[in-house]
Amino acid sequence: DQEWLELEAAACDYEARLLPPFFNTLAQYVEMDNSTFACPGHQHGAFFKKHPAGRQFYDFFGENVFRADMCNADVKLGDLLIHEGSAKHAQKFAAKVFNADKTYFVLNGTSAANKVVTNALLTRGDLVLFDRNNHKSNHHGALIQAGATPVYLEAARNPFGFIGGIDECCFDEHYLRDLIREAAPEKANASRPFRLAVIQLGTYDGTVYNARQVVDKIGHLCDYILFDSAWVGYEQFIPMMADCSPLLLELTPDDPGIFVTQSVHKQQAGFSQTSQIHKKDNHLRGQARFCPHKRLNNAFMLHASTSPFYPLFAALDVNAKIHEGE
């Protein structure tokens, strides 16, 4: 009998620790089957079931996806825009798993995540060191919306037409300062002329940078580096790729702050549109160049919907749990 009690206790303990914070709370709340007089108007799928086409739509996706689609005004699950309650706990858990100081879940893709970061950090008159491989969302966020001035890092192209890495000469400080003299002469001799560098950590054609080398070569010229990791995000969990991960770097107050954006839906476990922003800059606290949470979150709310789809958020939470390991 004692052995069975111990086995049952162990099983209960395992189940209690199995689910991550937000998904656990969401599952419990859905099980309560509370009525709502707010959004969404389909009322747990009831509206769909009033028409044959809607009924097939409901049956195809299953009951829980409709019951889990609820109003962001429901305080039981915490506000996703101001990061409270179980939503806050989920993002703190993900930050721990991915070795970030803070993590923000983004439900409208890394296109939005990149705009959040670039809008928070850049303004007109700032210099941005800009990888030619960058996704158009970085062009939109840094150059069009924020109005920053670019200094471009040229990319190689091999005989097969594949776009490779940034040319080695572009990482030379003298070369970069010559480019600055053309774009913004008044900043050519500044100790840190670039407010931000935007690097495509993994290119569409499969080139992945050594993050340590990038930081060592240009980090002293930049307040921050954004590594757009839309096509990667798995590198820190593969020992032979550890040097490619910006989030595994040991950073000092003289290093740049690090942002990493990841398309979880591409190479990790997430529904389409799920993305996350990792912020690693506690080593800059107390410095004028530090980007506080309030500033970043204002940019976050600029690009976030006030009607988030909770299953997307839950998928990001579960993705972190999967990557936690044993």
For the regions a protein language model found, what residue spans apply to each?
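Secondary-structure boundary/capping residues
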Residues: 35, 103, 126-127
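Conserved N-terminal alpha-helix of the aminotransferase class I/II PLP-enzyme fold
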Residues: 63-112
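N-terminal "arm"/small-domain region of PLP-dependent enzymes with the aminotransferase-like
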Residues: 1-84
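Short acidic/polar alpha-helix capping motifs at helix-coil junctions
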Residues: 53-59, 103-106, 179
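Short N-terminal secondary-structure initiator segments
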Residues: 1-14, 89-103, 224-242
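Conserved PLP-enzyme active-site core in the AAT-like
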Residues: 112-123, 127-326
